[in-house]
Design a protein with these regions (language model features):
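Conserved class I S-adenosyl-L-methionine
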Residues: 2-61, 74, 169-193
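Conserved catalytic loop of SAM-dependent methyltransferase domains
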Residues: 31-38, 212-243
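Class I SAM-dependent methyltransferase SAM/SAH-binding core
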Residues: 64-68, 72-128
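A conserved beta-strand element that flanks and buttresses the S-adenosyl-L-methionine
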Residues: 142
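A short glycine-rich, Lys/Arg-flanked "PGG" loop and its adjoining helix->strand segment in the class I
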Residues: 154-169
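Acceptor-substrate binding/catalytic loop of class I
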Residues: 188-205
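Core SAM-dependent methyltransferase catalytic element
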Residues: 254-275
Length: 275
């Protein structure tokens, strides 16, 4: 993609997420309230139960985390709640406003002292990333369901690598090309209609992307088939659709590994050996 086209696309993407921040409708209470914030988080982790396991929020207590594409801040809050020092950024200013209000509300609760452990940035990660407030770079760069929405994900990953400690971890989620969602259904219940850019990757393509950015891939796992009946889901009711309601759980979990929509990628910035 040419530079001029990339700039236009970035502006289009920014406008899209400003007008409909991701997951903002996960809550039924008035947007911005504490009740709404709790509803958003509960629904997010209910329908994507693999996310907290993948992020392993408690693992990063006292560690420095860079979150690329924080959206409305659900995972940001979870990292903070478990003691991480978080720099969170997003292209969407409207999304960041919600993240700021949520961290402000939760930051009132002792003993977390969140205000001293959170920084928010309205930036395009292709162009600029913050430096760690501490020394030596970030312990974790985390991005869940974001990089497939940017024109140049390789550039973002290379930028991120330059801000990380040697041996630090990268944990990202990318959409899978060969999934139940893409092969057998036109409905995208968790995604938002009209998204201007949403790439999908094979396992090999995802591995190649991460390795081209200078990381060593440790694991790539496929997961997540959306089992809920859409007409109930949009009304915040959770009724499983056919065939998911009749499948034994072990069979469903096996299918997720084969036809899941989410590629969960763990990698590290290699330690550079000196002569």
């Amino acid at each position: 993609m040419r530079q001029a086209d990339e700039t236009t696309m970035i502006e289009t993407i920014e406008k899209y997420w400003d007008t409909q921040p991701c997951n903002v409708k996960h809550g039924t209470a008035p947007v911005g309230t504490k009740e709404w914030s709790e509803q958003v988080r509960n629904r997010k982790y209910l329908v994507e139960p693999h996310l907290p396991l993948f992020a392993n929020f408690a693992m990063w207590n006292g560690k420095s985390v860079l979150e690329i594409g924080c959206g409305i801040g659900t995972d940001t809050l979870s990292f903070l709640e478990h003691g991480a020092i978080v720099d969170a950024l997003d292209l969407s200013e409207e999304s960041l406003k919600l993240t700021a209000s949520r961290t402000e509300e939760y930051g009132k609760k002792a003993p977390y002292q969140w205000r001293s452990r959170a920084r928010l940035f309205h930036v395009n990660a292709e162009d600029w990333l913050p430096g760690n407030a501490g020394k030596g770079g970030y312990d974790l760069v985390y991005s869940f369901g974001v990089l497939h929405h940017t024109p140049n994900p390789l550039k973002v990953l290379r930028n991120a690598r330059s801000k990380m400690k040697q041996g630090a971890e990268l944990r990202i989620m990318l959409y899978a090309k060969y999934s139940w969602k893409n092969l057998f259904t036109r409905q995208q219940p968790e995604a938002q209609g009209g998204c201007p850019l949403a790439r999908k990757y094979t396992v090999k393509e995802a591995r190649d992307l991460v390795e081209m950015a200078g990381f060593k891939v440790e694991s790539i796992e496929k997961t997540h088939i959306f089992p809920w009946r859409i007409k109930d889901y949009i009304q915040h009711r959770y009724v499983k659709a056919w065939p998911w309601k009749i499948l034994p759980k072990p069979v469903f979990l096996w299918l997720e590994k084969v036809l899941g929509w989410h590629l969960l990628i763990k990698a590290v910035r290699p330690v550079e050996r000196t002569a």
